[in-house]
Structures are given as structure tokens and as C-alpha cells.
């Protein structure tokens, strides 16, 4: 009888441990989603100039009269099997104080040279935004680059995360010492955001991607750190295909 009681108590204890662990995991997943929710709920913002009037997270890193500067970055990286890795993207700095925007379009080609040591060759093309149109500030002779800049759209302009709750059973990671956190979800090719990416980019794989929400800083909010979105289609040695996006508010350099 004593042995049976010990066995029952052991099973109950194990059940409690599993329940508590699962509960903590679910709770942390909800926290990670909530930390992204304020920013992602703004997607899509078709007219980028609307960001001049949108508030972001502010703390004591901001001067009281500083409205902050929105920093937007969208990038597509494609490396076919054992070929060069090509990253193309754009960064914009949208100053809410002056309502001016500048940034650059970039093309970064990484080659494996000199005994396997990677060498990158990044070219930047400065741009500005006028009347919601992105315009090069210097002459560009390469017609393909000019067209890529003219047609460029940031993920924030067409992505949609109105219902984060549809992403479930994610692989959650949290390190309170950094602090850093992430949530990874397997999505399908029928996902709205995946369809939008395939519509705009020539993605050389039919594999469905994983969605990664990752960030650093206080989970409850901080102007220090970052929050990134990443759709990873392929990730292995010699072959990488992924899209990354970020939108965050930072203190302005000119107050």
C-alpha cells in the first residue's frame, strides 16, 4: 500500500511539474507576442508619411520635446546552393520632429574567397522621400537599380499581423540576462504574408518558411534593443533564403 501511495504521489508530482512548465511556456509566448503587438498592429501602413503622426514606445532615453525617429528596414537575402549571397534592401530614417525622411537602398554581395573567408561588397544608393515617393538623391546609371528603388515597398506597407493569436505552439526562447527573446512558428505557403512576399520577390524555393519574432531589451518595452521579423525559407550551409523586417522608434539625433 505504501509503495502504491508513493507511486501515486510521484505521478501527481510529475503531472504538476509538466503542467507548470507548460503554463510558463504558454505565458512567455503570450508575453513575446504582446511585446510585438503594439508595433505589428500598425501593419499595413500603405502611406509611409502616416508614420510622422504615429507614436512609438518612448522612455527616459528621449528628450521631452523629441518625437523620435522611425527606422524602417526591409531586406531580402538569397543564396542559391553554394553560390554568392545577395542581400537587397532599404533603410529609411523618418524624423517625426522635422517630418523629413532619408536613407539608402543597398545591394550586398558576399563571396567566399581567400580560403573560404567571406568577403562582402556592399553598395549604397542614398534616397529621400518626397510626397510618399522614394527618390534617389544621386544619379544612378544602372537602370535595374533605379527600377528596383522606384518599385520598392517596405513590408510595413503590405504585411498584416492583425491577428497574432493565429500563430500557435511556437518554439519560445527567453534569456533574462541579455535580455533576449524569440518565438518561432512554422507557417504555410497559404499564409497571407508569405503570399505577399512571393508576389514581390523571386523566391527560388517552394518550401514554406518559418516565421521568427525576435528581440532584445525589456519585454515590456524599451527604446534600447531591437525587434525583428524574419521569414526563413532555407537555412543551411551554402544555401540561405530569408526575408527580414524591422520597424522601431529611436531618439532623434537632432532634438
Swiss-Prot record:
Coiled coil (UniProt feature): none
Annotated Gene Ontology cellular component terms: plasma membrane
Lipid-modified residues, N-palmitoyl cysteine kind: 24
Domain of life: Bacteria
Signal peptide annotation: 1-23
Keywords: Cell membrane, Lipoprotein, Membrane, Palmitate, Signal
Cellular compartment(s): Cell membrane
Lipid attachment, kind S-diacylglycerol cysteine: 24
InterPro entries: Csa (IPR007595), Csa_sf (IPR038641)
Bilayer disposition of the protein: Lipid-anchor
Entry similarity comment: Belongs to the staphylococcal tandem lipoprotein family.
Name of the protein: Uncharacterized lipoprotein SA0092
